[in-house]
Amino acid sequence: MSLFDKKHLVTQADALPGRNTPMPIATLHAVNEHSMTNVPAGMEIAYFAMGCFWGVERLFWQLPGVYSTAAGYAGGYTPNPTYREVCSGQTGHAEAVRIVYDPAVIRYEQLLQIFWENHDPTQGMQQGNDHGTQYRSAIYPLTPEQSAAAHASRERFQSAMAAAGNHRPITTEITHATPFYYAEDEHQQYLHKNPYGYCGIGGIGVCLPPDA
């Protein structure tokens, strides 16, 4: 596909067929050795897409209260896609991060603050120099409460941008979580395994106002 084509989401009818076999990954998180698949009692899950998932995953695994993180693909159609397929723009997925967190230590609203303040949510089908539908900004809520918090935070951040003189519209999609597919093991905790690797995330200098 051309770069122009990759700026437009593929339709479900035109998406690649994928496969039934899940991607094999390591059982344990390379940084904290917690399970990357199990969710301990009392923990919750959040899904965010902010561009290249290498830097995004590191951003969240460093937070107190985050039990584990995983790089993967969300918001698309193709079952169990490969990285190459996602980068083709023919699966509909965004590069996303799965975050398992303890809400008694860090709230979903605090994760949303990290989300908004650490990337540019106005760039459509790109993030910085990374172009393609897989780099779009997205929040994939799992519950009505997460959805309400996500939409409210988007309104507050848009207002904060306007107050700072930035009138570009936010392009972040907020849609109910579709299946999350783990990325290949080489992408898991990539910047821990490759400390000098590429990290393309960065904020726009606007802070998310607290919920009134």
Swiss-Prot record:
GO terms for cellular component: cytoplasm. It catalyses: L-methionyl-[protein] + [thioredoxin]-disulfide + H2O = L-methionyl-(S)-S-oxide-[protein] + [thioredoxin]-dithiol; [thioredoxin]-disulfide + L-methionine + H2O = L-methionine (S)-S-oxide + [thioredoxin]-dithiol. Disulfide bonds: none annotated. Keywords: Oxidoreductase. The keyword Oxidoreductase applies. The keyword ATP-binding does not apply. The active site is at 52. Its EC number is 1.8.4.11. One of its GO terms (biological process) is protein modification process. InterPro entries: Met_Sox_Rdtase_MsrA_dom, Met_Sox_Rdtase_MsrA_sf, MsrA_MetSO_reductase. It holds the Pfam family PMSR. It comes from the Bacteria. GO terms for molecular function: L-methionine-(S)-S-oxide reductase activity; peptide-methionine (S)-S-oxide reductase activity. HAMAP family: MsrA. Belongs to the MsrA Met sulfoxide reductase family. Has an important function as a repair enzyme for proteins that have been inactivated by oxidation. Catalyzes the reversible oxidation-reduction of methionine sulfoxide in proteins to methionine. PANTHER family: MITOCHONDRIAL PEPTIDE METHIONINE SULFOXIDE REDUCTASE (PTHR42799:SF2). This is Peptide methionine sulfoxide reductase MsrA. It comes from Salmonella schwarzengrund (strain CVM19633).
